[in-house]
Amino acid sequence: RDRIQVLVANVDVIFVVSGLDGDFNLRRLERYLAVVREGGAKGVVLLNKADLCPEAPRRLAETILVARDLPVHVISAKKGEGVDVLAQYLTPATTVALLGSSGAGKSTLVNRILGREKQATKETREDSRGRHTTTSREMFLTPGGAILLDTPGLREIQLADVAEGL
């Protein structure tokens, strides 16, 4: 439990995916962003499941304050809403990793970007907690030539030697 685990390496962009449903947690998002900033990759915040959240505008405003200089996009991976804006990050030879808690919709987003069902997905439980359907990291080549790395959902994230993001 006390050991440090490397989440991803050699990536250009990290999509930090947070569900706008019951998964939304601003403090956890701050921890993700601190880790991203410390790691040196370009961070992009994706607020997913916009179709399930009537409070999306308020949560977007809160997230923009926390994200500071990082871009924030509201999307619905399941319905395809807002996903087209991600093409600017998915350029040829760019490696993009997805980070977020279980149930945030990372694998659904992978399927949407790839244009086909490559990753198994499940409905989120009634309490909005994920089911850990993705259990290992997996790489995919996108139609535009980017490398997309899907990662298992994280139950928790703690900061280790992160100075810049605090």
What are these regions (language model features)?
Residues 29-33, 58-60:
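Charged helix-capping and loop-helix junction motifs
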